[in-house]
Amino acid sequence: MNTRFPSSKMVPFHFPPSKLALWNPMPIGECIYLHLSYYRKPKLMVTEKAIRLAYRHAKQNKKNVPCFLLGSLTVDEDEEGVTLTIDRFDPGREIPECLERTPTASLPGDFLIPCRVHIQGLGSRDVIVHNADDFSSALKALQYHVCSKDFLDCGKLLCLRAQITPRESLDGVDFNLQWTAVTLANSFKCVPVKPIPIIPTALARNLSSNLNISQVQGTYKHGYITMDETRKLLLLLQSDPKVSSLPLVGIWLAGIIHVYSPQVWACCLRYMFSSSIQERVFSESGNFIIVLYSLTHKEPEFYECLPCESRTPDLQFQLLTNKETLHLFNNVEPSGKNPIHFELSAESQDAEAEAEVLSKISKTLPVKRSSQKLSPGKIPINKHDTDLEDEDFSPRPIPSPHPVSQKISKVQPSVPELSLVLDNNFTESSNQSNPLEMMTVENPLLIKPSQPELCDAKHSSEATTGEPFRRGPTNQLSQDTALRQSRGKQSSTCKKESLQFRNTNAKPSLSVPSPDVAEKLQAVSAGSMQKEDYPVRPSTLDSRQPSLAPQAQPHNLVFSTHNSTRPMELQVPTPSLPSYYPTNVCSCCQHHGHIQYSTINSWQGNTVGSIQDLRSESLPKHAFFHSSGCPSLCPNAIYSSSSPVSMKQGGMGAYSPHSNGEPSPVAGPSHVDSCVPHPCAMCMHTPNTAPDNGMMGLSPDAYRFVTEQDRQLRLLQAQIQRLLEAQSLDPGSHKTVATVEDTVKAAKQMELVSMEAQSSPGLHMRKSVSIAVSTGASLFWNAAGDDQEPDSQPKQDDTKISSEDMNFSVDINNEATSLPGSASSLKAVDIPSFEESNLAVEEVNQPLPESNSSSEQSKEPGVPVFFPNALLAESVSMCLQTAPTEGASNSTELPQGTKDEPYRPSDNQKIYQDLLGQVNHLLSNASQETEEPPTKAVVTNRECAKTQNTHHARKKRHNSGLVDKDCVLSATIKQLRSLGVKIDSPTKVKKNEQKVDHASVLACISPEAVISGLNYMSFGNVGMSSLSPTGVDLSMEANAIALKYLSENQLSQLSLARSKQNNGDSSVGLLHINSDRSTVGLSLVSPSNMSFATKKYMKRYGLLQSSDNSEDEEEPPSHADSESDHVLNRNPACRPVQCGHEKEPSWNACEIAQCSDCGSADTRTDVPVLRNITNQAVQPRATEHLNEDSAISLRNLKPNPAMNLRTGKAEFTHHPEKENERDIAVFPGTLPSPETLKQMNSMDSVGTFLDVKRLRQLPKLF
């Protein structure tokens, strides 16, 4: 084995005998300084979610226990600084053997920040960020990491602590955040020198290659350098055991671009203070070598590095602080994409005091000084040598470099040992003065600065002069920080100027009041602020900040200066709001519990709807302003435009684009005076701020948004006014305009606020509807009260208009129709609102009021109207109009809701009123014909003329005489207007009849007879969307059922049939009624997927094919057919009505008459009739003479591709199998065979069943 040395020609390695002139020290470039914060201050990026979680945790735990914020520290891309991202919260946990709380879910590489949240609202003097123990533990942790052999992490060279003091304000929470970090103050300067030869070892060749070890591992690498006798450099890994025995001359790094990277600084600290290095060899001037394998250079770079302090430096520490006040709004989702930015700064007037405090504590630390050369037997006992490689693989000369005492020191951690020494020394050194008092005097940044609550600027000036050292610099720092944070990502020129001003004029500016300091810092602002105005309007100082730099905070919060928050926090007589946005709210507004600064949404590009929804969430708690309130006395258009008070009658907001800080006239009409008191005298002398050229101190984007918002509001209110005027001219309308008193009374009726009552914001209701199904009680109203309903409804049902949205809907749900017999079903279907709106309104879900019941008419465009009994069900068809492609009824649209209808003419009101008046007219006669069991209403889209003819046919059949159409029409209009429904005009029908979107003739079917647990909404959209590609086929629940029971082939078949039918004649498809008793909209449901009981149940009611399809039917086959012919022959109301260029008679009127006659025929046997829910298959004779013009029964509306899901026509289904326990005839007798239907329309009977592409995007409900 010994012969290998001569064969390999290896010679013993020796350091140069002379330690002089080891390399050429001639500089070839400029000097570069190394420090963590030399080029850029450390940045903090804190997510709003983490702060909210810490605040919530502190409120729940009254003990004020410490918690933790977790994040990660990364080096910036340009390597000029570091960024700490704090995005998690950890409540911490207690460990029995540990005195302090530890995080519960800390991961390797996490940056741990101890945090305390003071909920009690302590004063500024009582809030201490660091105490003695905190400082000592932080310094020991820094020393340990620098001296150990652990992996070098820049994040462990920065010990950060947080202090959060929340204070609840009117619309959110003010957070006073104090960040205090301790880091090492040792810095280095390095100068590039000429290259030095390197021994070409495997490590050196790897580092010089294109794919070195740092690039493979994706992280930077560093190690140490020694030298041989020829003065060539030998590179060693950090973990090489020879590091502890060889003289070292410097360090090498790879995977780094620039030498000023914080990672290079950390490696220099490790080289200077590592306890595992026995001997360091410096040049004559005390320099060492840095070899940098840069990612951007092919050859290594050589630098000569010198500690800036001294040749044998000690560990020095530096304090970095930041104090900010931010405001987070209530009821706003935290924005995770835009964190809050902070900067840790060491530039302050208290640098000397901080250095003195830290030096006193650091003197207690033992071995801090690194020796140039230490003999192997004199390695410090507290060496942090935890790597076992030294014991296992290091060379073992005699005497051994690992004595017994050293091994013992490795077993016992050195941190507790240091802790004992440090605590004793610190206690002794602080016996002369109280530690808290010492830190208060010598290092005010350790304690939140005190700011007395003053009532005038004179006292403020005196107090500031009396406390020059403590208060002055801190005010400047907070002013500078607030200004810097308010600028966002803009240039930091002003920041640097203010810093320069603060540093150069430090001492003279100590006695200057902070408002004046802010005036100097805000030299860009042109206004002058009088001192006597400061106590009254502290936010005036902050209100001019946007003129210095526009505020465009995307994270729903605004920083305010430290001064502006103090009066609000503790001083009750003269409170003030911090300038969350430049709102200039007067000091008497402290009681406005519901002032909503809606600008938080405007910065995100949200629309009026979202702002109003935000208001509607938080404002109902305070229905009206406090009596001492004085809101909206500011030129801020954003606040005024969305404030409940500012939206006065006539659309004139309480602001003007050119108000320039003057108080806006808030005192409106007399009906608003009760809600909005006159401003107090203190508020009326608002000083003018800096001239803003009519932009009210806003950024251009914000001002544009406010202008557009104002324009839209004015347009909306003008349209509402026109609608109200048209309604007031209508003789059939009992009540046209709602007053404030009416609005208050109608708050329980889910009525929206009219524009005269806009000062009561608590009435903005949810635009959704709950529809009762699956209970017998919910299928019909109380028949006994039908006669009284038309008389009582006009008294209760006041139509009201809300300017909070540019949308309109109808709500005929009131206390008169909410009878005891119409309680909502437990199986209600909530249909969300999908508006067609270019504003992209995102609504907030709100519960429906208690008065909501099954009789409520939908606010949705796709929810039908339901009728109380069989009389209505047989002959009433609604003339419904919706937004485009919704296929749903729009008789539900009235100027009191929230549908986007700024462009719909006012002549819709007449048709709506005619429609609902006819309904109420039928309701009034309902109790006279109780011999016929209730079935359900057939809801169709058809013309008003058809409605009148159908009603005429019904009156002829039941009363054996014709009723004058004019009488019927007048009664219909009267009743409809009493309920506030407006009926579309025939001219609008003709205008839109070119584009047929949706039509459906939905007959009666028992949902529970199809599939157990299925309500009527499951088939509300069956076969309605094949006419237009913009349609949606099924409701979500039916889609889910189809996905559950249909195979892939069947789904593909349906999609193919749908695509084929889209190219065919849509009018033909309208007239098809599926006669196959096994389908009922589910013709492809496979019996193999059902249980035996389900199959038997469905076969019994003709829902599946069986050997005897009529085994459970009681009617003869030709019964319904003959009745249908009879109705068609004898009922003139079913005759076709020619309309414009249309050639075909309407099928709907005849279908209504036919269904009515069938119902009367069924009455003889007391068996309710179930009819097919689909509208695809057609009866041949109906096709022959009614095939040409089904378009007359459709509403033509503009296609809306934005609609992704619309509810279709739904049935109000009576459940006879539950209520009368009778067998049910599922369909009328003789209907064409499935073969005939297939010949007529190929696969159209199921072609519009569903759209597979959209179906797969909907959630499965089963």
Swiss-Prot record:
Q: Where in the cell is it found?
A: Cytoplasm, Cytosol; Cytoplasm, Cytoskeleton, Microtubule organizing center, Centrosome, Centriole; Cytoplasm, Cell cortex
Outcome of swapping residue 643 to A: Abolishes mitotic phosphorylation and decreases mitotic index as well as CDK1 activity
Signals that turn on the gene: Down-regulated during cell terminal differentiation. Accumulates during G2 phase and falls at completion of the cell cycle.
Provide the phenotype resulting from gene inactivation: Death during embryonic development between days 8.5 and 10.5. Embryos are reduced in size and display delayed development. They have axial midline defects, and randomized cardiac looping. The midline sonic hedgehog signaling is blocked in these mice.
Extract the ranges annotated as region (Disordered): 369-409, 454-551, 650-670, 782-804, 883-904, 925-959, 1106-1129
Entry's Gene Ontology BP terms: apoptotic process; centrosome duplication; determination of left/right symmetry; embryonic axis specification; floor plate development; forebrain development; heart looping; in utero embryonic development
Composition skew (Basic residues), residue ranges: 949-959
Q: Where is this region: Interaction with CPAP?
A: 220-762
Interaction with RBM14: where is this region?
1-992
Region (PIN1-binding) residue spans: 567-760
Q: Which InterPro entries match?
A: Sil (IPR026123)
Stretches of Polar residues bias are at 473-493, 500-512, 540-551, 883-895
- What Pfam families would the database entry show? STIL_N
Record PTM:
Ubiquitinated.
Tell me where the signal peptide lies: none
Q: How does it assemble?
A: Homodimer. Interacts with PIN1 via its WW domain. This interaction is dependent on Stil mitotic phosphorylation. Interacts with CPAP. Interacts with RBM14 and this interaction interferes with the interaction of STIL with CPAP. Forms a complex with CPAP and SASS6. nteracts (via N-terminus) with CEP85; this interaction is essential for efficient centriolar targeting of STIL and subsequent PLK4 activation.
Q: What does this protein do?
A: Immediate-early gene. Plays an important role in embryonic development as well as in cellular growth and proliferation; its long-term silencing affects cell survival and cell cycle distribution as well as decreases CDK1 activity correlated with reduced phosphorylation of CDK1. Plays a role as a positive regulator of the sonic hedgehog pathway, acting downstream of PTCH1. Plays an important role in the regulation of centriole duplication. Required for the onset of procentriole formation and proper mitotic progression.
UniProt protein name: SCL-interrupting locus protein homolog
Give the species this sequence originates from.
Mus musculus (Mouse)
